[in-house]
Regions:
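Short alpha-helix in the alpha/beta-hydrolase fold that links the catalytic acid
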Residues: 70, 79, 93-102, 127
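Catalytic histidine-centered segment of alpha/beta-hydrolase-like enzymes
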Residues: 91, 116-128
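Catalytic active-site module of serine/aspartate enzymes centered on a nucleophile-bearing elbow/loop
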Residues: 124-140
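Alpha/beta-hydrolase active-site loop
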Residues: 1-9, 72
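Hydrolase active-site cap/lid region
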Residues: 24-79, 125
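Alpha/beta-hydrolase fold nucleophile elbow
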Residues: 10-21
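Short beta-strand/loop motif that positions the catalytic acidic residue
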Residues: 76-78, 82-89
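Catalytic histidine neighborhood in serine/cysteine hydrolases
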Residues: 98-119
Length: 140
């Protein structure tokens, strides 16, 4: 609903979708079902079932109402995709982003951040520098 409202005010070629951690699933879905300028994912998981099996194997995955399959959504994206992940992330390992990049059917870039865990990415100097460069290069 929010994306539809934003589209009333802005052309999609000016909209950047971003999602952090669990929010990467919603962001990927929005990018796959719309035409934003780009998609930026921070510490994304491969898909929610995969994440649950890694972190909580004792919980049956059929209880998930929403599967939130980043791996599936990224195949349908038509915009550039930027994946950021901390190398020290113990909640969602950076290998998740490496697997996701292989699913992208469009221009994608994986930026691994040294000495960064799952939290604090927005405050990380390297992340800020890379985001500034990406936004300037894409004229946002």
């Amino acid at each position: 609903l929010v994306y539809k409202i934003i589209k009333l005010e802005y052309d999609e070629n000016r909209i950047v979708i971003t999602g952090y951690s669990i929010g990467s699933g919603i962001a990927s879905y929005l990018a796959a079902t719309n035409h934003p300028k780009m998609l930026i994912l921070q510490a994304p998981y491969y898909n929610l079932v995969d994440l649950m099996q890694q972190k909580m194997p004792f919980v049956p995955t059929f209880i998930l109402k929403y599967k939130l399959e980043n791996n599936r959504y990224l195949k349908s994206c038509h915009c550039p995709i930027y994946l950021f992940h901390g190398k020290e992330d113990t909640i969602i390992p950076f290998q998740s982003s490496q697997k996701l990049q292989k699913e992208c059917n469009t221009v994608s870039q994986l930026i691994l951040l040294d000495d960064l865990g799952h939290n604090g990415m927005n405050e990380n100097f390297m992340y800020q520098s890379e985001i500034e460069k990406i936004l300037n290069d894409r004229r946002i």
